[in-house]
Regions:
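Short C-terminal tail/terminal secondary-structure segment
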Residues: 2-5, 149, 238-264
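Alpha-helical segment proximal to the catalytic Tyr-Lys
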Residues: 131, 172-177, 235
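Active-site helix of classical SDR
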Residues: 126, 160, 168
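C-terminal helical subdomain
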Residues: 183, 202-237, 244-246
Length: 264
């Protein structure tokens, strides 16, 4: 298993959606361990503030404002990253969003916007970064357990996550011998503290108990998974999806089990 305190000095990570949530955690943790980080996010003020904070701490960070749903923004991100760092060791396709589904309803433009952010952008960025990937480079796609299970009215997000999951194994085969491509499927990850510094979680006993691990996930859980998959010592892992959900999707529950009932 990769050491979460490993020195990443000189390694270049490119992260989409790197200003908030899981992406912010990755940006902070990787930079503080010596990695050079390029991030893109449409939250321009938040992204700039994060980059400036990390630079004051001695980090080497490039923030590029932009919406990954737009091809021009993707090209600009790749160009700026290559110009600043020369090459890339790890691309983390993290950005996504949801705009509900059939019951809301989610219309044509909204549905396609989610797919552009969650599927088209990862494909295009991988393609655009190809000339700049260094030896032993890897792509890590952030999918979700919602790629293979759902709640009602989540079609836009589920479709995007299903798409990036399929894209992962397809790209791994296409880039065999050049770039490893893997995915991480988070379950319930509480990102509140990476949106609001004053946030304090307030979980019920059931919130924790529904996870066989006995707790709700944190962005650091995903950070550790990113370290693991991007470690060159784990080069035999390719085209795989690593589920990080505390075992939640492995628990089978029928109505009447463990005091649980389905309301109809």
């Amino acid at each position: 298993m990769s050491d979460p305190n490993m020195d990443l000095n000189g390694r270049v990570y490119a992260i989409t959606g790197g200003a908030l949530g899981i992406g912010r955690c990755l940006t902070e943790e990787l930079t503080r361990r010596g990695a050079q980080v390029a991030l893109i996010d449409k939250e321009a003020d938040t992204g700039r503030a994060l980059a400036e904070q990390l630079k004051r701490e001695g980090g080497n960070v490039l923030f590029v404002p932009g919406d990954v749903a737009e091809e021009e923004a993707l090209q600009n991100f790749v160009g700026r990253t290559a110009e600043t760092f020369g090459g890339v060791d790890v691309l983390v396709n993290n950005a996504c969003l949801h705009r509900q589904g059939l019951l809301t309803p989610c219309g044509y433009e909204d549905f396609n916007y989610v797919l552009r952010v969650g599927v088209t952008a990862p494909y295009m960025l991988t393609r655009l970064f190809l000339p700049y990937f260094r030896k032993g480079a890897s792509v890590i796609n952030i999918t979700s357990t919602r790629a293979f299970m759902s709640q009602a009215d989540t079609e836009s997000y589920s479709a995007a996550k299903g798409g990036i999951s399929a894209l992962t194994h397809a790209m791994a085969v296409s880039l065999a011998g050049r770039v490893r491509v893997n995915a991480i499927a988070p379950g319930w990850i509480d990102t509140g503290a990476y949106h609001d510094p004053a946030y304090r979680p307030d979980y019920t006993r059931a919130d924790a108990a529904q996870h066989p691990s006995g707790r709700v996930g944190t962005p650091q859980d995903i950070f550790r998974a990113v370290l693991f998959l991007s470690d060159g010592e784990n080069s035999f892992i390719d085209g795989e999806t690593l589920t990080v959900d505390g075992g939640m999707t492995r628990r089978m529950i029928y109505t009447g089990d463990e005091g649980w009932a389905y309301t109809v």
